[in-house]
């Protein structure tokens, strides 16, 4: 079978089996298509290549300047592909099993201080329907720690302003209920009453935060809006990431003494070790404060 056909088979079955988001599947597809192109160029087959071939492919990528993080992501996709091919008997072995992951630098997530978050959230002009929407989105994002994808796809039926909760279908189709708090609930209510009808202009939509065309907003559009407000708030937009408010949500909870397992549940992390990064952020902050203010720091 042709390489690309095998990749398509894997992605279609893996998508259904794991309940992955379209964005995750698209990321796998891009990486594995790059592998497929290299195999075709070198007249190699997914069914017969060996570990040396895979090492050659990864080595070429590193020589071309691809970062270790990119190579690690590629290797992760390859491993899942070859595990599938072995399980489904397209291969008699798994050549990726002997490959080592590149060493990754330990990086703490980017986040904003509480004052920076306050400045950012107070930037939109709430007299303008579009900016009232953005204000509500920013408040909800900081109050709940939702992923950007979860925020822009949030539907009316999955939110109760009256009860102050949102129902989120996260990665792997896992459901979680997250409280939104009074401040976020107030601004969402204001948007629903005064901003959303203007944006919809008589059209219907089941998403809470529609675009100006009454459609679901893209992640990219929301990210551009966040950067716009960051610049207005005199925050270095280049230092931000799309999940900056999610990271701020978690970091500020930990800073104020929240139990790590509660933060894990709110973020929708499967593994507690993923959440533990925020304890490191808190420790780094305490270390800097100690160095700054202690007489022997």
Swiss-Prot record:
Any one cellular-component term (Gene Ontology): Holliday junction resolvase complex
Domain (Tyr recombinase) ranges: 107-291
Protein origin, superkingdom: Bacteria
Keyword DNA-binding carried by entry: yes
Annotated keywords: Cell cycle, Cell division, Chromosome partition, Cytoplasm, DNA integration, DNA recombination, DNA-binding
InterPro entries the record matches: CB, DNA_brk_join_enz, Integrase-like_cat_sf, Integrase_catalytic, Integrase_recombinase_N, Integrase_SAM-like_N, Recomb_XerD, Tyrosine_recombinase_XerC/XerD
Subcellular location, principal: cytoplasm
Residue span, Core-binding (CB) domain: 1-86
Residues the record marks as active site: 147, 171, 243, 246, 269, 278 (o-(3'-phospho-dna)-tyrosine intermediate)
GO molecular function, a single term: tyrosine-based site-specific recombinase activity
Location(s), subcellular: Cytoplasm
Functional description taken from the UniProt entry: Site-specific tyrosine recombinase, which acts by catalyzing the cutting and rejoining of the recombining DNA molecules. The XerC-XerD complex is essential to convert dimers of the bacterial chromosome into monomers to permit their segregation at cell division. It also contributes to the segregational stability of plasmids.
Complex and partners: Forms a cyclic heterotetrameric complex composed of two molecules of XerC and two molecules of XerD.
HAMAP family reported for this sequence: Recomb_XerC_XerD, Recomb_XerD
Entry similarity comment: Belongs to the 'phage' integrase family. XerD subfamily.
Protein name: Tyrosine recombinase XerD
Organism expressing this protein natively: Haemophilus influenzae (strain ATCC 51907 / DSM 11121 / KW20 / Rd)
């Amino acid at each position: 079978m042709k390489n690309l056909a095998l990749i398509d088979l894997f992605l279609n079955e893996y998508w259904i089996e794991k309940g992955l988001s379209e964005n995750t599947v698209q990321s796998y597809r891009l990486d594995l298509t790059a592998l497929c192109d290299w195999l075709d160029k070198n007249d190699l087959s997914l069914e017969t290549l060996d570990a040396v071939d895979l090492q050659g492919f990864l080595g070429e990528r590193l020589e071309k300047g691809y970062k270790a993080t990119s190579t690690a992501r590629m290797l992760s996709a390859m491993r899942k592909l070859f595990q599938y091919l072995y399980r489904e008997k397209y291969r008699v072995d798994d050549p990726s099993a002997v490959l080592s992951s590149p060493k990754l630098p330990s990086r703490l997530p980017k986040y904003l201080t509480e004052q920076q978050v306050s400045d950012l959230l107070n930037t939109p002009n709430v007299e303008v329907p579009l900016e009232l929407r953005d204000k509500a989105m920013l408040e909800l994002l900081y109050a709940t720690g939702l992923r950007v994808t979860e925020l822009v796809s949030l539907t009316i039926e999955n939110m109760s302003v009256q009860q102050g909760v949102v129902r989120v279908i996260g990665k792997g189709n896992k459901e979680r209920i997250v409280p939104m708090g009074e401040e976020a609930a107030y601004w969402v209510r204001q948007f629903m009453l005064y901003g959303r009808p203007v944006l919809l202009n008589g059209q219907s939509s089941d998403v809470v935060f529609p675009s100006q065309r009454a459609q679901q907003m893209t992640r990219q559009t929301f990210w551009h809006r966040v950067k716009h407000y960051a610049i207005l708030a005199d925050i270095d937009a280049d230092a931000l990431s799309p999940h900056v408010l999610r990271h701020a949500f978690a970091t500020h909870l930990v800073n104020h003494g929240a139990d790590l397992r509660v933060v894990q549940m709110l973020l929708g992390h499967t593994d507690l070790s993923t959440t533990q990064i925020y304890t490191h952020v808190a420790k780094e902050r305490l270390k800097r404060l100690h160095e700054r203010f202690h007489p022997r720091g």
